[in-house]
Amino acid sequence: MAKRILDATASDFEKMDQAALLESIHLAEGRTVCAEVVAISVPLVHAVTNAEMAAAFGADLISLNGYDVLHPMVMGAPGRASLALADLPIPIPADFPLGLGASISDVKRLVGRPVGTKLDCVPPERRDEFGGRVATVDNARRAVELGADFLWLAGNPGTGASTDLIARGVAEVAKAVGDQVIIIAGKMHGAGLGRADVVSEEAIRRYAEAGADIIVVPAPGTVPGATLEYTKDLVEAIHAAGPLAMTGMGTSQEGADVETVRQIAMMSKMTGADILHIGDAGFSGMAPPENIMAFSIAIRGQRHTYRRMALSLRR
């Protein structure tokens, strides 16, 4: 029998395939924390990746945002390539923590947790703008090669990623790599298209039929109109369709005061979601660390939070 993600250690995660990880999340009964961090932001603390910081404050899953699979970079991580700048007398050495060339597997070794990346489902005419961040089959395969445990097909603000584009992207990516990696689908906001194109039961049906393992809906109290009852109905629709459900806090409220974050966490748990996500909109590409910890404590108490924070990577 699979371990609950609450009890899993770094060595446990190394042995899990996508089916085992999904079961581990399911067994935790709504007590899984996913923290999103911007891979290419200057980290909150010098020479420590935001992924490490989020993991240290209680995250079970780390989602990289802004990670380009064609030009990998995770600020704060040891690099695998040198950078030469015209206005510098010497190249910046590879061991300077710019994280040039850092793979997802490199991040996993640093944090001892499952790590995945977002791929944006942008309109075809905008694909060149986003390069290795676009949800294409080739980029998905590259992300898997780089070590991704999950791929989140969604849309960042202003990308124009519609629910239709996400559904199509999920179908293509799931067909190509769905047997190797968890597929997450869904937006936490309009992605530049307004409130009408955030989520619907029809979108949920399409995502599930396309092959999504986890479907995302906005957390209660985030996007306008996302009440507890409304979000609970969407979560029930997701479970009825088969996938796991994740509530997402992607409206910059992850950078609000601790009490607001606690309220959103508790309402999210009341919806019946399997995973509760906290976004990356702090001052430096991640939520304030104390908010991640408060978010975790709210949904599973000090015992499980401190355990996750303290567990050694050597276990």
Residue ranges and their predicted role:
Residues M1-A28, P43, A281-R315:
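N-terminal charge/polar-biased segments
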Residues A2-F13, V37-V74, P78-A167, E172, ...:
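Active-site beta->alpha loop and helix N-cap motifs at the rims of alpha/beta catalytic domains
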Residues Q18-E29, A55, S103-G116, I166-G178, ...:
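Surface-exposed amphipathic alpha-helices with a cationic face
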Residues V48, D128-V134, A191-E201, E229, ...:
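Active-site-adjacent loop and "lid" segments of alpha/beta metabolic enzymes
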Residues V74-A94, L98, L234, M270, ...:
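C-terminal helical cap(s) of enzyme catalytic domains, especially alpha/beta-barrels
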Residues S200-I204, V216-P224, T231-D233, M270-A273:
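A structural signal for small-residue-enriched, beta-sheet-centric alpha/beta enzyme cores
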Residues M249, G279-A281:
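Short beta-alpha connecting loops at secondary-structure transitions
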